[in-house]
């Protein structure tokens, strides 16, 4: 069957579901890619001015819930209807994006982000279920390919645009996300049709309790549980793309060279995407990971299909660890961008194979249960990633933390950061007392405190996942499942 014939077989609701996914991913990643910067940025920019530890706590806990709660929210959606849950998810989303701008305390921002993640958890299982319901064995492969393409298009355009409007203020970033969610609300309200489902007499509470029984059924398989724990280590390293990379770029990387390179060929485009200072924002740069996936996923998938899923995962994670070294080990904007490409190639090789591998090792009569519980590895990975981006990152690579250490070492008198003295004020005053420009201060801290050594931690974590997967394959997994 040709691709055109396959396209004709998809019902209208299939395309509508993909459109909803596109706008939701635009809203989420437009917000999420820069969320770490929003949490730790200086207050006069409209950011929160939190510490790296506070940022890691907020992002790690909320994102963990985002991947854990769908185990429950999927059961709720099946019981009360997809359309109702979608509308509720979009209302929670929009109100959360609005709320988080209104507060300045750690506690209220934390609660607001949890609220946003609850909205995401209600949304997450529905569209993938709709794709499954509107495809058959003949159309499923291309159908899910279209779905994942929508995920990555939204994941690229959202932060790419957010990075451009960020110069006007954080409120513009949140308003763009709210606008995308509002469009989804209207599409769902007026055009989304509830799929046909078999009604069951099972009470709602019993339906919610069933997923926990399913989780227990899978986790008593100690080999599978061990595999999930190992993969959570991979996800912890991978998620530094969101938790620390934009902050590292903002603090240490010279993106002016990228801007100048683009400007020399396409000056109008450089002026459009660049900052007034002649740089590329950290959020816009980070969005290139999704762009690389859009450009190369098909080619990479064709290449790795010749390998067993576990071997492809190990190779992909190894490549990803090299990408982490290039992303966090240098100040050159072009090398960091190349590191993002290497990171993306590793992601393309390993992440899709994770799902395939779970399907391969699951008992034939429990594949759905195993696929559902596989999200526990991602949830745990987010919690670990939040911890790593907190105290470990702060002590090794947080620019403010390192500057405070130097101020103390020199015995300088710089006021403490507070409501009337921001992080920017601290950097300016410290630089003045040390007779440095801001660039000279950055270079001094880079050469004296070596924040680039954070790559050793992140790459080592990724490599440890490779080693553990190798040992798991050789000594834990039964031969028939290799």
Predicted features, each with a name:
Residues 1-14, 198-228, 261-262:
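Juxtamembrane intracellular "pre-TM" segments in multi-pass secondary transporters
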Residues 171-190, 405-411, 452-471:
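Symmetry-related core transmembrane helices of the 12-TM Major Facilitator Superfamily/SLC fold
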Residues 91-105, 318-331:
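C-terminal ends and interior cores of transmembrane alpha-helices
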Residues 122-136, 349-363:
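Intracellular juxtamembrane helix-capping segments at the cytosolic ends
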Residues 33-54, 243-281:
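Short amphipathic helix-loop junctions that connect adjacent transmembrane helices
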Residues 57-75, 287-300:
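Central cavity-lining transmembrane alpha-helices of secondary-active solute carriers
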Residues 139-166, 180-184, 373-389:
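Glycine-rich segments within core transmembrane alpha-helices of 12-TM secondary carriers
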């Amino acid at each position: 069957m040709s691709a055109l014939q396959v396209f004709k077989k998809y019902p209208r609701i299939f395309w509508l579901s993909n459109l909803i996914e596109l706008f939701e991913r635009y809203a989420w990643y437009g917000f999420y890619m820069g969320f770490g910067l929003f949490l730790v940025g200086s207050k006069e920019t409209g950011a929160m001015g939190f510490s790296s530890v506070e940022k890691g706590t907020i992002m790690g806990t909320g994102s963990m819930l985002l991947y854990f709660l769908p185990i429950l929210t999927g059961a709720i959606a099946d019981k009360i209807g997809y359309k109702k849950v979608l509308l509720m998810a979009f209302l929670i989303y929009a109100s959360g994006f609005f709320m988080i701008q209104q507060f300045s305390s750690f506690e209220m921002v934390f609660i607001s982000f949890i609220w946003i993640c609850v909205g995401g958890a209600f949304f997450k299982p529905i569209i993938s279920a709709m794709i499954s319901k509107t495809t058959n064995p003949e159309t499923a492969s291309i159908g899910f390919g279209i779905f994942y393409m929508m995920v990555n298009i939204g994941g690229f355009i959202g932060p790419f645009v957010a990075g451009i409007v960020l110069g006007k203020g954080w409120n513009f970033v949140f308003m763009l996300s709210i606008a995308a969610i509002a469009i989804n609300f209207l599409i769902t309200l007026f055009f989304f049709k509830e799929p046909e489902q078999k009604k069951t007499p099972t009470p709602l509470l019993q339906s919610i309790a069933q997923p926990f029984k399913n989780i227990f059924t899978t986790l008593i398989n100690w080999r599978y549980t061990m595999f999930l724990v190992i993969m959570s280590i991979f996800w912890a390293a991978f998620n530094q793309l969101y938790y620390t990379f934009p902050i590292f770029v903002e603090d240490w990387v010279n993106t002016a060279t990228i801007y100048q390179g683009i400007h020399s060929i396409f000056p109008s485009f450089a002026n459009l995407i660049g900052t007034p200072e002649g740089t590329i924002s950290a959020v816009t740069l980070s969005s290139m990971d999704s762009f690389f996936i859009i450009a190369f996923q098909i080619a990479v998938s064709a290449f790795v299909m010749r390998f067993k899923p576990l071997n492809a995962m190990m190779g992909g994670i190894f490549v990803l660890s090299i990408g982490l070294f290039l992303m966090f080990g240098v100040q050159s904007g072009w090398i960091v961008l190349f590191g993002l490409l290497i990171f993306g190639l590793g992601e393309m090789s390993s992440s899709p194979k994770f799902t395939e591998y779970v399907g391969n090792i699951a008992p034939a009569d429990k594949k759905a249960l195993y696929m559902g519980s596989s999200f526990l590895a991602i949830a745990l990975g987010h919690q670990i990633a939040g911890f790593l981006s907190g105290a470990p990152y702060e002590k090794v690579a947080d620019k403010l933390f390192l500057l405070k250490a130097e101020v103390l070492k020199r015995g300088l008198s710089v006021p403490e950061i507070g409501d009337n003295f921001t992080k920017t004020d601290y950097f300016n005053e410290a630089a003045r007392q040390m007779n440095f420009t801001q660039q000279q201060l950055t270079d001094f801290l880079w050469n004296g405190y070596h924040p680039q050594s954070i790559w050793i931690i992140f790459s080592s974590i990724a490599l440890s996942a490779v080693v553990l997967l190798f040992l798991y394959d050789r000594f834990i997994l039964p031969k028939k499942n290799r």
